Protein backbone atom coordinates (compact mmCIF):
# COMPACT_ATOMS: atom_id res chain seq x y z
CA UNK A 1 0.00 0.00 0.00
CA UNK A 2 1.13 3.58 -0.59
CA UNK A 3 3.58 2.06 -3.10
CA UNK A 4 5.79 0.51 -0.39
CA UNK A 5 6.73 -3.17 -0.62
CA UNK A 6 7.66 -3.33 3.08
CA UNK A 7 4.12 -2.80 4.33
CA UNK A 8 2.40 -6.04 5.36
CA UNK A 9 -0.71 -4.72 7.14
CA UNK A 10 -2.10 -1.19 7.12
CA UNK A 11 -5.28 0.71 7.86
CA UNK A 12 -6.03 2.29 4.53
CA UNK A 13 -6.90 5.94 4.19
CA UNK A 14 -10.49 6.18 2.96
CA UNK A 15 -12.04 9.61 3.43
CA UNK A 16 -14.37 10.46 5.00
CA UNK A 17 -14.72 7.12 6.83
CA UNK A 18 -11.09 6.53 7.77
CA UNK A 19 -8.60 9.40 7.83
CA UNK A 20 -5.25 10.21 9.42
CA UNK A 21 -4.07 13.61 10.53
CA UNK A 22 -0.77 15.42 10.47
CA UNK A 23 1.27 15.08 13.65
CA UNK A 24 1.84 18.68 14.66
CA UNK A 25 4.87 20.28 16.22
CA UNK A 26 5.65 23.58 17.88
CA UNK A 27 8.65 25.84 17.64
CA UNK A 28 9.53 29.49 17.22
CA UNK A 29 7.80 30.84 15.19
CA UNK A 30 4.57 28.96 15.81
CA UNK A 31 3.45 26.40 13.23
CA UNK A 32 1.52 23.76 15.13
CA UNK A 33 1.44 21.66 18.28
CA UNK A 34 4.29 19.83 19.93
CA UNK A 35 2.46 17.07 21.72
CA UNK A 36 4.97 14.28 20.95
CA UNK A 37 8.53 14.96 22.11
CA UNK A 38 11.38 12.46 21.77
CA UNK A 39 13.38 12.10 24.98
CA UNK A 40 17.14 12.33 25.33
CA UNK A 41 17.15 8.60 26.03
CA UNK A 42 15.69 7.90 22.59
CA UNK A 43 18.10 10.28 20.87
CA UNK A 44 21.03 8.61 22.63
CA UNK A 45 19.84 5.14 21.56
CA UNK A 46 20.88 5.77 17.95
CA UNK A 47 24.41 4.49 17.32
CA UNK A 48 27.19 6.36 15.61
CA UNK A 49 27.72 5.74 11.91
CA UNK A 50 30.35 3.06 12.64
CA UNK A 51 27.84 1.02 14.64
CA UNK A 52 29.06 1.92 18.12
CA UNK A 53 26.79 3.04 20.97
CA UNK A 54 27.56 6.71 21.57
CA UNK A 55 28.81 5.87 25.09
CA UNK A 56 31.66 3.94 23.42
CA UNK A 57 32.00 5.99 20.25
CA UNK A 58 35.26 7.48 19.03
CA UNK A 59 33.52 9.85 16.59
CA UNK A 60 30.53 11.16 18.59
CA UNK A 61 30.64 14.78 19.81
CA UNK A 62 28.33 16.20 22.47
CA UNK A 63 28.67 19.62 20.84
CA UNK A 64 27.59 18.26 17.46
CA UNK A 65 25.44 15.29 18.50
CA UNK A 66 23.60 14.74 15.22
CA UNK A 67 26.79 14.35 13.17
CA UNK A 68 28.14 10.88 12.33
CA UNK A 69 25.02 9.07 13.55
CA UNK A 70 22.67 6.33 12.41
CA UNK A 71 20.69 8.05 9.59
CA UNK A 72 17.43 7.02 11.25
CA UNK A 73 18.04 9.65 13.93
CA UNK A 74 17.45 12.49 11.47
CA UNK A 75 14.42 10.68 10.04
CA UNK A 76 12.81 10.43 13.46
CA UNK A 77 13.83 13.57 15.34
CA UNK A 78 13.55 17.26 14.52
CA UNK A 79 16.10 19.35 16.36
CA UNK A 80 17.35 22.89 16.74
CA UNK A 81 18.57 24.47 13.51
CA UNK A 82 16.61 22.25 11.12
CA UNK A 83 14.15 23.71 8.64
CA UNK A 84 10.55 22.57 8.37
CA UNK A 85 7.59 24.25 6.69
CA UNK A 86 9.76 27.19 5.69
CA UNK A 87 11.03 28.12 9.16
CA UNK A 88 14.18 27.34 11.12
CA UNK A 89 13.54 25.55 14.39
CA UNK A 90 14.85 27.27 17.51
CA UNK A 91 13.93 25.22 20.53
CA UNK A 92 15.46 27.25 23.33
CA UNK A 93 16.12 30.91 22.50
CA UNK A 94 15.01 32.33 25.86
CA UNK A 95 15.12 31.22 29.47
CA UNK A 96 12.27 33.57 30.36
CA UNK A 97 9.89 31.82 27.98
CA UNK A 98 9.64 28.67 30.06
CA UNK A 99 10.71 27.16 33.35
CA UNK A 100 13.15 24.83 31.61
CA UNK A 101 14.45 27.32 29.07
CA UNK A 102 12.87 25.15 26.37
CA UNK A 103 9.15 25.77 26.05
CA UNK A 104 7.91 28.85 24.22
CA UNK A 105 4.43 28.18 25.60
CA UNK A 106 2.25 25.24 26.56
CA UNK A 107 2.32 23.60 23.13
CA UNK A 108 6.10 23.72 22.68
CA UNK A 109 8.54 20.86 23.17
CA UNK A 110 9.39 19.93 26.73
CA UNK A 111 12.53 18.00 25.78
CA UNK A 112 14.15 20.19 23.12
CA UNK A 113 13.22 17.76 20.34
CA UNK A 114 10.22 17.26 18.06
CA UNK A 115 8.92 14.21 16.25
CA UNK A 116 9.86 14.12 12.57
CA UNK A 117 8.56 10.68 11.62
CA UNK A 118 5.08 10.95 10.05
CA UNK A 119 5.38 14.68 9.34
CA UNK A 120 4.26 15.50 5.81
CA UNK A 121 6.24 18.54 4.55
CA UNK A 122 3.73 19.04 1.74
CA UNK A 123 0.99 20.03 4.21
CA UNK A 124 0.80 23.50 5.71
CA UNK A 125 -0.05 22.91 9.38
CA UNK A 126 -1.79 26.28 9.52
CA UNK A 127 -4.11 25.45 6.64
CA UNK A 128 -7.71 24.35 7.03
CA UNK A 129 -6.99 20.76 6.00
CA UNK A 130 -4.78 18.59 8.20
CA UNK A 131 -5.53 15.23 6.62
CA UNK A 132 -2.40 13.43 5.49
CA UNK A 133 -4.04 11.17 2.95
CA UNK A 134 -1.69 8.35 3.99
CA UNK A 135 -2.34 4.79 5.11
CA UNK A 136 -1.60 3.95 8.76
CA UNK A 137 1.01 1.19 8.85
CA UNK A 138 0.33 -1.56 11.41
CA UNK A 139 2.93 -4.20 10.48
CA UNK A 140 5.92 -3.84 8.18
CA UNK A 141 8.60 -6.29 7.11
CA UNK A 142 11.22 -5.03 9.56
CA UNK A 143 8.98 -6.20 12.40
CA UNK A 144 8.98 -9.73 10.99
CA UNK A 145 12.77 -9.71 10.70
CA UNK A 146 13.39 -8.43 14.22
CA UNK A 147 10.83 -10.81 15.70
CA UNK A 148 12.69 -13.70 14.06
CA UNK A 149 16.11 -12.40 15.13
CA UNK A 150 15.01 -11.97 18.73
CA UNK A 151 13.39 -15.40 18.97
CA UNK A 152 16.20 -17.23 17.16
CA UNK A 153 18.86 -15.76 19.43
CA UNK A 154 16.92 -16.94 22.48
CA UNK A 155 16.64 -20.56 21.35
CA UNK A 156 19.95 -20.74 19.45
CA UNK A 157 22.40 -18.11 20.78
CA UNK A 158 24.39 -16.23 18.16
CA UNK A 159 22.83 -18.21 15.32
CA UNK A 160 23.88 -16.99 11.88
CA UNK A 161 20.27 -16.56 10.80
CA UNK A 162 19.60 -14.23 13.74
CA UNK A 163 22.46 -12.02 12.58
CA UNK A 164 21.20 -12.12 9.01
CA UNK A 165 17.69 -11.09 10.02
CA UNK A 166 18.72 -8.09 12.11
CA UNK A 167 21.34 -7.11 9.53
CA UNK A 168 18.73 -6.96 6.78
CA UNK A 169 17.16 -4.13 8.75
CA UNK A 170 20.50 -2.42 9.29
CA UNK A 171 21.69 -2.79 5.69
CA UNK A 172 18.53 -1.11 4.48
CA UNK A 173 19.60 2.15 6.16
CA UNK A 174 23.33 1.80 5.52
CA UNK A 175 24.35 0.79 9.04
CA UNK A 176 27.28 -1.62 9.61
CA UNK A 177 26.30 -5.24 10.15
CA UNK A 178 26.42 -6.86 13.58
CA UNK A 179 28.91 -9.75 13.65
CA UNK A 180 30.66 -12.29 15.91
CA UNK A 181 34.05 -12.71 14.23
CA UNK A 182 36.01 -9.46 14.66
CA UNK A 183 36.34 -8.24 18.24
CA UNK A 184 38.10 -5.05 17.14
CA UNK A 185 34.94 -3.62 15.58
CA UNK A 186 32.14 -1.90 17.54
CA UNK A 187 29.56 -4.20 15.94
CA UNK A 188 31.05 -7.29 17.62
CA UNK A 189 28.69 -9.51 19.65
CA UNK A 190 30.56 -12.06 21.78
CA UNK A 191 27.67 -13.48 23.78
CA UNK A 192 23.97 -14.19 23.52
CA UNK A 193 23.25 -11.18 25.72
CA UNK A 194 25.41 -8.93 23.54
CA UNK A 195 23.27 -9.79 20.53
CA UNK A 196 20.09 -9.66 22.63
CA UNK A 197 20.79 -6.08 23.69
CA UNK A 198 21.68 -5.01 20.14
CA UNK A 199 18.47 -6.54 18.78
CA UNK A 200 16.47 -4.78 21.48
CA UNK A 201 18.07 -1.49 20.58
CA UNK A 202 17.33 -2.16 16.92
CA UNK A 203 13.65 -2.52 17.85
CA UNK A 204 13.82 0.84 19.57
CA UNK A 205 15.45 2.87 16.83
CA UNK A 206 13.77 1.19 13.86
CA UNK A 207 10.28 1.57 15.33
CA UNK A 208 10.81 4.82 17.20
CA UNK A 209 7.62 6.88 17.51
CA UNK A 210 5.52 4.27 15.70
CA UNK A 211 2.17 3.93 17.40
CA UNK A 212 3.18 2.76 20.85
CA UNK A 213 5.20 -0.31 19.81
CA UNK A 214 7.82 0.45 22.44
CA UNK A 215 5.42 -0.25 25.32
CA UNK A 216 4.89 -3.83 24.13
CA UNK A 217 8.63 -4.35 23.79
CA UNK A 218 9.48 -3.29 27.34
CA UNK A 219 6.63 -5.40 28.69
CA UNK A 220 7.80 -8.45 26.77
CA UNK A 221 11.36 -8.00 28.01
CA UNK A 222 10.27 -7.47 31.62
CA UNK A 223 11.97 -4.07 31.90
CA UNK A 224 8.91 -1.80 31.92
CA UNK A 225 9.19 -1.00 35.62
CA UNK A 226 12.80 0.16 35.28
CA UNK A 227 12.17 2.12 32.08
CA UNK A 228 9.05 3.90 33.27
CA UNK A 229 10.41 4.73 36.73
CA UNK A 230 13.47 6.43 35.26
CA UNK A 231 13.36 10.25 34.96
CA UNK A 232 12.68 11.73 31.53
CA UNK A 233 15.59 13.81 30.26
CA UNK A 234 15.69 16.46 27.56
CA UNK A 235 18.39 18.28 25.65
CA UNK A 236 21.56 19.63 27.24
CA UNK A 237 21.85 23.40 27.53
CA UNK A 238 23.37 26.17 29.60
CA UNK A 239 22.85 29.90 29.95
CA UNK A 240 25.77 32.14 28.93
CA UNK A 241 26.36 35.88 29.09
CA UNK A 242 25.43 37.72 25.89
CA UNK A 243 24.45 41.34 26.45
CA UNK A 244 24.00 41.95 22.71
CA UNK A 245 21.58 39.14 21.83
CA UNK A 246 19.86 38.45 25.14
CA UNK A 247 16.37 39.59 26.06
CA UNK A 248 16.47 41.99 29.06
CA UNK A 249 14.13 39.63 30.90
CA UNK A 250 16.84 36.98 30.74
CA UNK A 251 19.39 38.97 32.68
CA UNK A 252 21.81 39.34 29.78
CA UNK A 253 21.97 35.63 29.05
CA UNK A 254 21.13 33.39 26.09
CA UNK A 255 20.70 29.65 25.87
CA UNK A 256 23.45 27.53 24.29
CA UNK A 257 22.44 23.99 23.36
CA UNK A 258 24.37 20.75 23.86
CA UNK A 259 26.37 22.02 26.81
CA UNK A 260 25.87 21.98 30.56
CA UNK A 261 23.17 19.78 32.08
CA UNK A 262 20.25 17.84 30.65
CA UNK A 263 16.78 19.21 31.21
CA UNK A 264 15.18 16.94 33.82
CA UNK A 265 11.45 16.56 33.36
CA UNK A 266 8.78 15.07 35.58
CA UNK A 267 9.35 11.40 36.27
CA UNK A 268 6.94 8.58 35.55
CA UNK A 269 5.70 6.00 38.03
CA UNK A 270 5.40 2.47 36.71
CA UNK A 271 2.21 1.93 38.68
CA UNK A 272 0.53 4.89 36.95
CA UNK A 273 0.60 2.98 33.68
CA UNK A 274 -1.25 -0.09 34.99
CA UNK A 275 1.32 -2.44 33.51
CA UNK A 276 1.68 -5.96 34.82
Question: Whereabouts are the PLM-identified features?
Answer:
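Nucleotide-sugar donor phosphate/pyrophosphate-binding loop at the beta->alpha transition
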Residues: 31
